[in-house]
Regions:
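Electrostatic cytochrome c docking/interface patches
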Residues: 1-26, 114
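Second-shell loop/turn segments in exported
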Residues: 12-13, 56-57, 81
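Gly/Gly-Pro-rich "capping" loops immediately C-terminal to redox-active cysteine motifs
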Residues: 24, 36, 40-69
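The canonical Cys-X-X-Cys-His
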Residues: 23-37, 79, 95-99
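Axial heme c-ligation environment in periplasmic c-type cytochrome domains
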Residues: 46-51, 70-103, 107-114
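Conserved functional loop/turn residues at catalytic and ligand-binding sites
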Residues: 30, 38, 56, 74-75, ...
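Low-complexity, Gly/Pro
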Residues: 16, 40, 87-88
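Sequence context surrounding c-type heme c attachment/ligation sites in exported
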Residues: 21-28, 61-65, 86-87, 104, ...
Length: 114
């Protein structure tokens, strides 16, 4: 998927506490080894792992679709693709929502269930 196509993707899963919790489960299973439990990156494991709490450091874009593409297809030289491990697209979208929840509050989308 091209970066332009990724930018056009819209997350069909609302940004809710339930979605964030479901995304957290996927994150804990597949992502903490490189990004750490807090999302701040395990640079002692992967030197160029992205600190997911700082969107300004993202190299492959910060839109929902760009994050989705980075997880599904991989990004850069060290972020592997997870399309064969996370095969359900809804689970990927929940993960995108969880990643957004790691951002500073002023940068997060508004919760839909408040």
């Amino acid at each position: 998927m091209s970066s332009e196509d990724a930018k056009k993707l819209k997350n069909p899963v609302p940004f809710t506490k339930k979605s964030i919790a479901q995304g957290r489960t996927t994150f804990q299973r597949f992502c903490t080894g490189c990004h750490g439990a807090d999302g701040k990156a395990q640079v002692d494991v992967v030197a160029d792992a992205t600190d997911l709490t700082s969107p300004n450091l993202y190299k492959s874009g910060t839109s929902d679709g760009e994050i989705f593409r980075s997880v599904r297809d991989g990004a850069g030289e060290t972020m592997p693709p997870f399309q064969t491990q996370i095969t359900n697209e809804t689970d990927l979208w929940h993960l995108v929502n969880f990643i957004h929840s790691l951002w500073p509050e002023s940068m997060r989308p508004p919760l839909k269930d408040q």
